[in-house]
Structure formats: C-alpha cells, structure tokens
C-alpha cells in the first residue's frame, strides 16, 4: 500500500471507487460508502442523484471493517498532506438480496471451495463453475445493460458533485 500512500499525498482531489459484484438487489447497483465518510448517506444521495447509497454498517448493508475503502481513508488521514478524498464501493448485486438468494450465494462459494480443495465429478465441477460465474458476472444481457447504466449514472453524479465535470 506504499503506492497508495505516495499517491494520496501528492494529489489534491481523489475519487477512489472499489468495484464489487455479488451482494445487493439484482438490478440495482449500490453505492456503499465508508464509515469514515463525513457526509450523511442522505446528503450523498441528494448530491450525486443516485437512488441507492448505503453506509458501511449493518443497518444499511452488512457491517464491514478493514476493506479497501476503509484502508484508503485511514492512509489519507495519516498523510502529512491529505487529499480531498471520496472513496466508495460500487456493489453490483448479481443474485438478489432475498434470504434464498443469499443462501444461493453461499452455496456457490462453498461449492467453488470444495472444487478447489478436493477433486469432484465433472458434473459437479460444471455446476459449481456455472454458479460462481453467475454470482460474479451474470450472463443475462439485461443485467449487464442495467449494471452499465447504473455505473454511468453514479460515476457522472459523483464527478459532477465533486466538480470534475459539468
């Protein structure tokens, strides 16, 4: 992370976006902010004109401590010349956020790990590969188009709010 330290100390304004696929509603990308973000979730929603902005806590999303954006905020905070930083995560939901979909997600991870650590039948391997692929990059064209549209809307909203574009 030495590079991040160097870059953050020499740049006036930084927009850091960590991209994830997996959790959340299937057809709605979530913007997941750090617990260190100074603005409230409501302010961010209004300022970037994006409908689904969450904080990084159990009330909004699922509680995380120690992920990339948290680390970037801590590095920046310790810098002798901190950047004007906005670090966030774009979470592209792939399976959906129901209890059943969460179980399917867990199943995909377990099956993939099982394949990795122990030889399985070719049928099991194919099934497991299909599950894990759909969890991280759905094949459905509608999903891909919506993910692109959401990404574009959120990135434009952030860049306009931070006055990087008009």
Residue ranges and their predicted role:
Residues 1-166:
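C-terminal accessory segments enriched in acidic
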